[in-house]
Regions:
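Alpha-helical transmembrane segments of multi-pass membrane transporters/permeases
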Residues: 69, 82, 139-166, 180-187
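Short alpha-helical transmembrane segments in multi-pass integral membrane proteins
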Residues: 1-2, 59-128, 174-226, 279-281
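Hydrophobic faces of transmembrane alpha-helices in multi-pass small-molecule transporters and flippases
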Residues: 2-10, 120-124, 147-154, 196-199, ...
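Hydrophobic residues within alpha-helical transmembrane segments
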Residues: 3, 7, 37-40, 80-84, ...
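Small-residue-rich hydrophobic transmembrane alpha-helices
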Residues: 31-91, 130-149, 254-281
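Helix-terminus/linker motif at the lipid-water interface of multi-pass membrane proteins
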Residues: 10, 14-32, 101-110, 166-176, ...
Length: 281
């Protein structure tokens, strides 16, 4: 069971690396803009994975007790939380992205800000693909079907790798979309992974059935999910990137004012460090 999880983590790390490789061919400013999106992207992933960890903790107990009715209720409440999370990130995608980049860039380079707003807005507004992907993958993991979780991530990553050059550079009749193309390719890859994971759940995950007939949110279940989720949430925000994640925002405000190339070098090193960390895990 551990090998599929290791491959899944490696594939997740490759998403950012592949995007960076193709975006770097556009310009230095394009890669800098994408790198500046890391803090909010980390927040998005932390919320999604944290909720998944909380859901898995409750599901494991219920499935161990063969209490499938309660397991279905837990899964339905978790799905409700993912929908609520998407609504929050949808609103943030429309409201916070421009102030977020402006707080880092000031008036240093408007092209970087323009690229960044295009990229991050697309990723956050259409984050339903990522949230659905992680939700269905966590359901598969909770019942030990990690091979299907790995398969869904591979499908999403391969889709992203194929679409990145096509949408960024305008190949095969597709209009040249630049940085926006990288974001669209990522979103499509996430949606493909979500569809594959959802299909695998429907066909193979017989222990858990999502049922929203007469559904009512359960405050106790939701509270317990977030009780366990907060540990993973803090891990993703603090431990995995500590101390670089918090310094990243501060450094970007300085380096983008001085010269983009210094910040670009730092961002590239951080991407490789993330890859090495996932590989070691």
């Amino acid at each position: 069971m551990s090998l599929p999880m290791m491959i899944s983590m490696l594939v997740q790390a490759l998403y950012n690396i592949v995007d960076s490789i193709f975006v770097a061919k556009l310009s230095e400013n394009a890669l800098t803009a994408v790198s500046l999106a890391f803090p909010l992207q980390t927040l998005l992933i932390a919320v999604a994975t944290g909720t998944g960890v909380g859901m898995n903790a409750l599901l494991s107990k219920s499935l161990g007790e063969h209490n499938y009715k309660k397991a279905n209720k837990i899964a339905s409440n978790a799905a409700f939380l993912y929908v609520c999370s998407y609504i929050v990130f949808l609103i943030l995608g429309f409201t916070i992205v421009k102030p977020f980049y402006k707080s880092q860039m000031g008036n240093a380079d408007m092209q970087i800000m323009e690229y960044g707003i295009e990229y991050l807005s697309t990723v956050m507004i259409f984050s339903f693909g990522l949230l659905a992907q992680i939700f269905f993958e966590r359901l598969l993991t909770s019942t030990g079907r990690t091979i299907f979780s790995m398969t869904s991530q591979l499908c999403g990553a391969i889709t992203n790798i194929i679409l990145d050059p096509i949408m960024i550079f305008g190949l095969l009749g597709c209009p040249r979309m630049g940085v926006t193309g990288a974001a669209v390719a990522t979103v499509i890859g996430q949606c493909v992974a979500a569809i594959v994971a959802g299909t695998c759940n429907h066909k193979f995950n017989h222990e858990i059935k999502l049922d929203f007939h007469r559904f009512r949110p359960d405050a106790h279940i939701i509270g317990t999910i977030y009780y366990y989720a907060v540990y993973r949430f803090c891990h993703d925000l603090l431990h995995e990137q500590n101390p670089h994640r918090f310094l990243f925002y501060s450094y970007s405000r300085i380096w983008c004012i001085l010269q983009a190339s210094e910040f670009l070098l730092y961002a590239s090193i951080r991407s490789e460090q993330r890859y090495n960390t996932y590989y070691c895990l």
